């Protein structure tokens, strides 16, 4: 079972939602964030180094202090407000004409430590430490992590009913073309039922946000150690997550661009790749990977399927077996990073 709870969100009023919303902290660098941030953008809180001229070291204490200052200011200016009661929220994301619906909730850090929240990536200590400092200083999770849960028909029905019978609190399209909608579930019985259903779900899976999840768990452990009367119900035990049903999930492509062929012709490159991969010409229509250890490649106007040959990866190597590692490790090519 997993432990979840509704919460009092600190969020923008309707009229400021699209102005406050921003891309996640780890998909753009400081210079890009500074150029992109508008006056009310959340980037001033999640990447506060942009408020210094020149841009400051993102790991310096003044930058961490600036994040706290900005979070407080956004609330005092009315750009962020806390809801009066604890709710669950439905968050919908639309991309390329396809919408997936998730539930925003608080998850328990001890479920992460026990393995009920499953992770599939290692974390970098420096990034984990950075996010931990932000959580500790803010006493809040500014960005949610992204979890998946096994499909549940009753949860699907609850979400569908709320979406059908209520206007969204937010409804806007961001600059990248992604649509964003949010509904507040204000009915207490519905919220109680969501909690009950998730108590019967054995596991959640981290889809995105390994560093933020690990950081929240570390802060929870710190607070637990300092509290001799710890019960497990304290606010510090919980962190912000948006959970999506596995059947709706679509993982966005994470592609690599090779700037040159290192002196090879396209034909020579394909010949080299054939040493480690079964290469199939898929023509001019876009091809997406169809299975584990299968990759797509666009070269000289055509799409190719690359399937790693047996022996090019070690099933016992937790890093080497990952699809993110296989293409670079076993092409026998010097690829730019």
Which stretches of residues belong to each language-model region?
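N-terminal extension/subdomain marker
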Residues: 1-160
């Amino acid at each position: 079972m997993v432990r979840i709870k509704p919460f009092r969100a600190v969020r923008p009023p309707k009229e400021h939602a699209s102005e406050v919303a921003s891309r996640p902290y780890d998909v753009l660098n400081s210079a890009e964030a500074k150029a992109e941030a508008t006056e009310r953008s959340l980037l001033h809180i999640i990447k506060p180094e942009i408020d210094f001229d020149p841009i400051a070291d993102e790991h310096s204490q003044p930058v961490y202090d600036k994040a706290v200052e900005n979070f407080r200011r956004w609330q005092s200016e009315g750009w962020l407000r806390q809801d009066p009661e604890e709710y669950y929220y439905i968050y919908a994301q639309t991309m390329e004409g396809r919408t997936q619906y998730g539930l925003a909730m608080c998850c328990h850090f001890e479920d992460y430590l026990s393995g009920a929240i499953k992770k599939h990536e290692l974390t970098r200590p420096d990034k984990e430490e950075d996010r931990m400092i932000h959580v500790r200083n803010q006493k809040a999770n500014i960005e949610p992590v992204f979890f998946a849960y096994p499909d549940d028909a009753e949860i699907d029905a609850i979400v569908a009913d709320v979406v059908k019978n209520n206007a969204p609190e937010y409804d806007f399209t961001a600059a990248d073309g992604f649509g964003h909608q949010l509904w507040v579930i204000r009915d207490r019985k519905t919220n109680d039922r969501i909690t009950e259903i998730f108590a019967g779900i054995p596991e959640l899976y981290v889809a995105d946000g390994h560093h933020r999840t690990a950081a929240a768990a570390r802060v929870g452990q710190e607070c637990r150690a300092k509290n001799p009367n710890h019960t497990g119900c304290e606010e510090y035990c919980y962190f912000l997550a948006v959970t999506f049903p596995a059947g709706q999930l679509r993982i966005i492509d994470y592609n690599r661009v090779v700037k040159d062929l290192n002196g090879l012709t396209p034909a020579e490159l394909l010949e080299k790749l054939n040493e480690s991969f079964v290469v199939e010409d898929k023509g001019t229509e876009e091809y997406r990977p169809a299975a584990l250890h299968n990759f797509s490649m666009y070269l000289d106007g055509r799409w190719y399927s690359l399937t790693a040959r047996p022996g090019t990866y070690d099933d016992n190597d937790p890093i080497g077996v990952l699809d993110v590692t296989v293409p670079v490790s076993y092409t026998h090519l010097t690829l730019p990073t």
